Amino acid sequence: TNQTFGQCMKIYTEKNNFPDLSNTKIAIIGVLEGRASVGNYGTGLGLDEVRKELYKLYPGNWPINVADLGDIIEGNTIEDTYFALNELLSFLIKGKIIPIIIGGGQDLTYSNYRAYDKLEQTVNIVAVDNKFDLGSIEDELTSQSYLTP
């Protein structure tokens, strides 16, 4: 195909209506959140630059429907952002759509994990990082304490 990845996917913007997800297999979600990204300022920024480069790529030789659902903006509190992400992920997972999250910090992994609660599914998470981000139950959730031993 001569079309780029960006030309092949459904893209939601303020100008476009929310895309029909009936045949969508993968959904990209941006998260404009970085308040709990300790020592990693800007994790919720620059998503348009990431998209610009992603959209330039050429898709492989497999038919897969992808939608870019836009960005979840930073809530009044970080818990508001977690709630919005959790609700959207639960909806996508229930519809058998694989979510890909861009932006935000490692603390969003916990919200991603909790999206499976409503579905009563067991989930395993693999975290690839340069260190273990272990904290205790009592610790505030941050990018450096989102896992517990």
Spans of model-derived segments:
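Conserved alpha-helical scaffold segments that buttress catalytic/binding sites
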Residues: 1-30, 34-149
